[in-house]
Amino acid sequence: MTSNQSHKAVVFGSISIDKIVNKYGVFSNVLGGSAAYALLANKKNTCELVGVVGDDFEKKHFNLLSEHSITTNSLTQLGGNTFCWGGEYKDDFSSRKTLYVDPGVSESYIPDLSKHSKNCPFLLLGNTAPNLQTELLNQMQSKPFVLLDTFKLYINIANKELKALIKRVDLFCINFNEARALSGMDGADVKEMSKAILDLGPKSL
């Protein structure tokens, strides 16, 4: 799918095939990923999706993303498996634990933005590896409003890279458990944790 529409925003992050375990049952082969859900939450054809999938990515998933993205020129398909994630949610859905993660083709993927994308006014860096988020931000030629998302896995395994990126963004999105892990303040209240995270350099939280 191609389009001459202006690029209002670039949405980048994970596109995955998930296995979800919750009180209602076990759900396999579910379309997941931060970029996929961020794209689908927006009005159709206002954002460009940037990401990678494997050759196991089902056509029904591709068609759904194609219907919502301005173009799929930046949705790369490589030989191999799509990023996979399995998670189990508490009965009240207040938290989850990761059962497994398989990065698949995303492990060797380097994003490459189009000229239009490099000059868009808004950039959403959805949850994915901080080194890939940084690579994409470095390609921007404009100075977009940057929204950054992450989750506990990357706080634990890529803390240094994540903190270097946080200071470059306009809005950093994080939940309570992630804030506790990032701030290292297990017994602190929300205000104290928020101050510690804002001290890392994001303009807002």
What are these regions (language model features)?
Residues 5-8, 17-29, 44-124, 138-143:
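Conserved N-terminal subdomain of the carbohydrate kinase-like
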Residues 13-15:
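Active-site metal-binding loops of divalent metal-dependent hydrolases
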Residues 33-44, 137:
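Histidine-anchored nucleotide/phosphate-binding helix
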Residues 54-56, 127-132, 151-155:
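Short beta->alpha connector loops
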Residues 61-64, 132-139, 160-164:
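A short acidic, amphipathic alpha-helical/loop segment
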Residues 103-108, 150-157:
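Short gly/ser/thr-rich secondary-structure transition/capping motifs
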Residues 141-143, 154-205:
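Conserved phosphate/ATP/ADP-binding segment of small-molecule kinases
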